[in-house]
Amino acid sequence: MYDYEDLNWYDYYLVRGFAVVECGGLGTKGSDGFETCGTDLEIDAFKCVIEWLHGDRVAYTDKTSNVAISADWSSGKVGMTGRSYAGTTQFGLATTGVAGLEPIVPVAGIASWYEYTNSQGISTNSLVNYSERLGWYCNGRYLDPDDYATIAEKYGNYMYQ
């Protein structure tokens, strides 16, 4: 029996018949690629997951075996919720018009990168390379020293190109 006064988000949705899926963004710990916080590359990666859940994209069990896996357990209707990074990505995904994305419930997030970094047209951040610094901040791959050692130079070159 659930105490509805003390549910976490997952339990809230699970007891109502929803499946809960978590996926890491590009460059976050345990994933591939480089963190590019808020860019079209990052939004497209999450869009691919929604397309898979909707039945419009093929996914594979791993990078080498070429064994396809379907989300046959999914109704194809995808909702999103979250705060901060997880809230921000929802706004970006909603602008793509991806089929299957139904409600978004961003508890907190950046809806406008321009407004987030500017006030009345003037930058509110003294850091010249703010987007690069934000990318470094959101990048979780540096938490795994063995993994980060394999990408450090390329990631640095990518961020400051």
Task: Give the residues covered by each predicted segment.
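Flexible loop/turn segments at secondary-structure boundaries
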Residues: 28-31, 86-89, 111-116
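Accessory cap/linker subdomain of secreted extracellular hydrolases
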Residues: 3-7, 15, 43, 61-63, ...
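Accessory recognition modules or surfaces
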Residues: 1-6, 28-43
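Gly/Ser-rich "nucleophile elbow"/oxyanion-hole loop immediately N-terminal to the catalytic nucleophile
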Residues: 36-41, 48-84
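Extracellular/periplasmic catalytic domains that process cell-envelope and extracellular macromolecules
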Residues: 12-16, 71-74, 97-98
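Serine-hydrolase catalytic-loop signature spanning alpha/beta hydrolases and amidase-signature enzymes
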Residues: 1, 20, 52
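Conserved alpha/beta-hydrolase
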Residues: 14-30
